[in-house]
């Protein structure tokens, strides 16, 4: 395998989130928006666990300003506030967002914890319209008020006034915008005494680490909890870079899980989890040892590892040897089900699709996006227009297309940083050190090939924090992909786990 081919999948984490960000990309509005906020409020009721819960939905744009007080943008959000609570000052409030960088939060909004959700097909392509939008019995409104936020340039959020892309499209710039929004929301709505939570997905977990630390350092706003759905804090753990074997090791147990799911193994065990434990051990011990030897590995050692790797992944020994024991994600997705004329997914590897080119070395598309993207786009537009009474005369942007223009250079603070280092685990560590009562919960999808579970486990076991703080971190696992809430049973489990997390973190 040449270095050039390996570089196709360098920064696999960005590939994961960039697909979400770039999918459904639309042109920006022709005219820059005015700097006046717009709001629409409506009253609703949802029944959760036999309890009728009235709530107010507030959809609108919040004006952001620079340090000189000049307007720079309007950030769109939808807030759901329980309306039968006399004193909201102590009721939990959660801020939710997706990733990208540059993705709207329609996925979490219309799929996870909001009062409504779009119905999709479990692990398969969802047929075209009409799509059903139903009351979401897994909503968290019985536990917390919810504020879904669209990143700048996505949804109905727009750069305005004196603002430019450079003010928002970067690690620290993006976090600063979210921090300003949250601070404004908390002050306007009298929620300073409320337990506060961040719930981010994918790059939204990366953002949460920076944002959680920033809120505490800049605004002295201490959070109760941060819930990370499909987490990535160190992008290098997902990068198939020349000379760096870590990603091959970290991805290997996920390859095994996907091969097991698609029944691509010659000797497929009945139970997944014991099989995954074997795969973890093999990856960390035998596989890692031979990879780290590099060119010093003997032919005998390579053959032995190739045989075991084939048994775990369903790839032929010959293919593994020709790949020099190093199969990157796109190659795996193209090769695993090639004999069936299919490629497997990245965001959710349970999804498969046909391909034009059965000879291609790497998978060029992700079946997941085609599988559910149409349903979510239709649902979020219809819901905003018809129920929230907002945005009918403008475009809801699934993405701002900012991934390729993102500023990864850090501005410093909250730990030791190096320019352009794609790692924010120090931000989270600093947030937990500053606030030793901050709880963190991580939600992992077993079939998530965008942010696999093993690199996440490695990151969270290497935060360098005290043992007492390490106890504040909880790991949860689901037999689903990147968006585990799209699987009916796992959406219930996710809801129960996050509800328990909010209850636990709110008791002080």
Q: What feature does the model see in each segment?
A:
Residues 115-119, 216-311:
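A catalytic-pocket lid/entrance helix-loop region that shapes and gates access to the active site
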Residues 191-203:
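Alpha/beta-hydrolase fold nucleophile elbow
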Residues 200-213:
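Glycine-rich nucleophile elbow surrounding the catalytic serine of serine-hydrolase chemistry
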Residues 479-490:
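Catalytic histidine-centered segment of alpha/beta-hydrolase-like enzymes
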């Amino acid at each position: 395998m040449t270095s050039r081919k390996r570089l196709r999948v360098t920064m696999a984490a960005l590939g994961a989130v960039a697909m979400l960000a770039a999918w459904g990309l639309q042109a920006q509005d022709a005219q820059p928006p005015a700097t006046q906020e717009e709001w629409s409020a409506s009253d609703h009721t949802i029944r959760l666990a036999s309890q009728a819960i009235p709530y107010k939905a507030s959809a609108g744009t919040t004006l952001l300003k620079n340090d000189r007080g000049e307007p720079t943008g309007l950030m769109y959000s939808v807030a759901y506030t329980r309306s039968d609570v006399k004193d909201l000052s102590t009721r939990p409030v959660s801020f939710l967002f997706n990733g990208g960088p540059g993705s709207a939060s329609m996925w979490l909004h219309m799929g996870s914890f909001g009062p409504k959700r779009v119905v999709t097909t479990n692990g398969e392509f969802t047929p075209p319209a009409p799509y059903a939008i139903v009351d979401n019995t897994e909503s968290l409104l019985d536990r917390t008020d919810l504020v879904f936020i669209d990143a700048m340039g996505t949804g109905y959020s727009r750069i305005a006034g004196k603002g430019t892309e450079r003010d928002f499209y970067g690690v620290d710039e993006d976090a600063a915008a979210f921090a300003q929004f949250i601070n404004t929301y908390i002050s306007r709505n009298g929620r300073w005494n409320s337990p506060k939570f961040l719930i981010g997905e994918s790059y939204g977990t990366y953002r949460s680490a920076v944002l959680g630390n920033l809120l505490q350092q800049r605004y002295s706003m201490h959070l109760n909890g941060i819930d990370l759905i499909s987490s990535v804090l160190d992008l290098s753990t997902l990068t198939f870079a020349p000379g760096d074997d870590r990603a091959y090791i970290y991805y290997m147990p996920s390859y095994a899980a996907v091969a097991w799911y698609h029944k691509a193994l010659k000797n497929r065990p009945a139970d997944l989890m014991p099989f995954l434990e074997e795969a973890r051990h093999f990856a960390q011990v035998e596989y890692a040892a031979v990879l780290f030897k590099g060119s010093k590995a003997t032919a005998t050692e390579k053959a032995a590892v190739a045989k075991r790797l084939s048994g775990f992944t369903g790839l032929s020994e010959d293919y593994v040897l020709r790949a020099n024991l190093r199969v990157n994600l796109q190659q795996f997705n193209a090769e695993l089900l090639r004999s069936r004329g299919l490629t497997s997914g990245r965001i959710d590897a349970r999804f498969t699709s046909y391909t034009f080119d059965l000879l291609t070395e790497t998978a060029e598309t992700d079946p997941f996006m085609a599988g559910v993207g149409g349903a979510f786009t239709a649902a979020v537009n219809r819901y905003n227009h018809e129920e929230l009474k907002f945005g009918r005369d403008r475009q809801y942007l699934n993405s701002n297309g900012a991934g390729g223009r993102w500023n990864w250079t850090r501005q410093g603070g909250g730990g030791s940083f190096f320019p352009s280092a794609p790692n924010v685990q120090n931000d989270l560590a600093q947030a937990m050190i500053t606030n030793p009562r901050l709880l963190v919960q991580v939600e992992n999808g077993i079939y998530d090939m965008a942010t696999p579970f093993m690199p996440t486990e490695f990151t969270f076991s290497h935060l360098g924090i005290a043992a007492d703080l390490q106890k504040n971190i909880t790991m949860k696992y689901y037999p689903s992909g990147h968006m585990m809430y799209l699987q009916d049973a796992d959406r219930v489990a996710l809801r129960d786990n996050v509800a328990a997390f909010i209850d636990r973190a709110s008791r002080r």
